A protein has these predicted regions:
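Non-catalytic, topology-defining segments of multipass membrane proteins
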Residues: 1-156, 161
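Cytosol-/stroma-facing membrane-proximal "stalk/adaptor" domains immediately downstream
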Residues: 152-179
Length: 179
């Protein structure tokens, strides 16, 4: 059951969503950017050696640790730097007031606005990965570098999907999906 504070916040938040906002388009843009980026990366991978494949689990674990750290140290703490403060505001002051333990579900696709990151966040995440790509390309191999950015980008897309699943009604897929 929704409390009065959460009802009021949801009503206020929803009233500020632009009339042209389309949740399906929002998600489509994110995944078009991500899948296009992955397609470009994969075009550069050639004759991967067995040990280069180790990049995937190593970077996958590192990405999850990074997400945990970011969530704990930035998304739940009002830091002074403007960029971090914006992340905190969006996550803690919007997302965690919109959704609570009592009500985690979307009403409709307009509610996706408070759940999915803006599409430019994926672009920023890709840009943050580029120095790692350059270093790995220089120090190890180009395959390791491309597998690195494939993993960071894929982790972002998987995170968005899994987070979405946290806010939909319980169903067979959500219950049995192996993540």
């Amino acid at each position: 059951m929704l409390g009065d504070k959460q009802k009021a916040f949801r009503q206020s938040y929803r009233s500020r969503i632009a009339g042209w906002y389309n949740g399906m388009l929002h998600v489509a843009v994110i995944y078009i950017i991500g899948i296009t980026a992955l397609w470009i990366y994969i075009q550069h991978i050639d004759n991967v050696l067995w040990w280069e494949w180790l990049t995937l689990p190593i970077v996958g674990i590192a990405c999850n640790l990074f997400e945990w750290y970011l969530h704990r140290q930035v998304m739940h703490r009002p830091l002074k730097w403007k960029g971090f403060r914006a992340i905190y505001d969006r996550h803690t002051l919007n997302h965690h007031q919109f959704f609570t333990d009592q009500e985690m579900r979307f009403r409709d696709q307009a509610d996706w606005r408070v759940t999915f990151f803006p599409p430019y966040a994926l672009v920023i995440f890709i840009l943050i990965s580029l120095p790692g790509v350059a270093v790995l390309n220089f120090l190890i191999t180009s395959n390791v570098a491309w597998l690195f950015i494939c993993t960071t980008t894929s982790t972002y897309l998987i995170y968005e999907f899994m987070h979405f699943c946290c806010h939909v009604d319980e169903n067979w897929f959500v219950r049995y999906f192996p993540f």
